[in-house]
Amino acid sequence: STSVSAQDSSNVVNASLDTLVVTATRSEEKIKDVPARISIIEPQIVEQSPIAELPHLLMSDASIDMLQYGGYGQTASIYMRGTNDTHTLVLRDGVRLNTGSAGTASLSFIDTTDIKQIEVLKGPASVLYGTDAIGGVVQLVSKTPEKTGAFVTGEIGEHSTYKSVIGADLAENGIYAQIRGQRLESDGTQVTDFKDAQVNAGAYDQKGFSAKFGIEKEQYAASVDYSENQGTSTYVDGINDANWNLIGLKNVSQDFKNEIINVKGRVNLSDNFALHARLSQFKD
């Protein structure tokens, strides 16, 4: 296993006082007005790491301790303020990604293609979010289209890692729509000293798509967001003999699939009062 503790926060951009955050109070506010301590992994950091999976991006924040076994798709745990990994809540646009069975989020299987910024709330937040947030909260904030256009991108990394993304955005008069499709493949990081190519692989194959539609006006707003992410993660399995030598090594594959549905609405009843509603679901 590999244990990484980020000690240098220079990669985490110091947000301006007017930067908007939603994690501290569950509503959009300027960072200068929120009482909680929040750091932000901002868009330029996310965009400079197009192939990076979520655990790699979170290592940019010095308040987070990360433990990951192997490379892409391998088990990763996040620790904040000395608490257990089940005490850090992970959200995407307000939707809980922690599973009911494990109590943690499958960080390695969360696609980061559409992430605008990552907000890290440091310290207890149980009053707002429940016991999952004793250590803190990590909120993934997705992008909202700002202009109409289409794009195709491709990225290449080490260990035969490839990522391609295709997408289109529409934004006009407060109405927006977005569609994305992406594919990530990697031969993975060698996790044993054995030279047998059949057991050294930690291959990862993941594909997904997302779509959103919304309207944003001064007095009201509504949006529908759907994303699906699936693939196969391969890891090495074996047993120890009487001398603690690994024997019977073989590749084991794990299929995964997750999907998020998020429907939100807002109506401003007055200058100081707004009504918010949300219907969301996460399947893993």
Residue ranges and their predicted role:
Residues 38, 46, 58, 118-120, ...:
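Non-catalytic regulatory/gating segments with a bias toward low-complexity or hydrophobic composition
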Residues 95-122, 143:
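Short acidic/polar hinge/loop motifs at secondary-structure boundaries
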Residues 19, 116-117, 142-156, 177-181:
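Transmembrane beta-strand segments of Gram-negative outer membrane beta-barrel proteins
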Residues 1-49, 55-59, 169-170, 207, ...:
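N-terminal Sec signal peptide and the immediately downstream disordered periplasmic leader
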Residues 18, 76, 136, 148-150, ...:
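Hydrophobic, lipid-facing positions within transmembrane beta-strands of outer-membrane proteins
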Residues 89, 149-151, 161, 176-178, ...:
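Membrane-spanning beta-strand positions in outer-membrane beta-barrel proteins
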Residues 139, 155, 167-257, 283:
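Periplasmic-side early beta-strands and strand-to-turn transitions of outer-membrane beta-barrels
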Residues 55-95, 99, 116:
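Extracytoplasmic beta-strand/coil segments of soluble accessory domains associated
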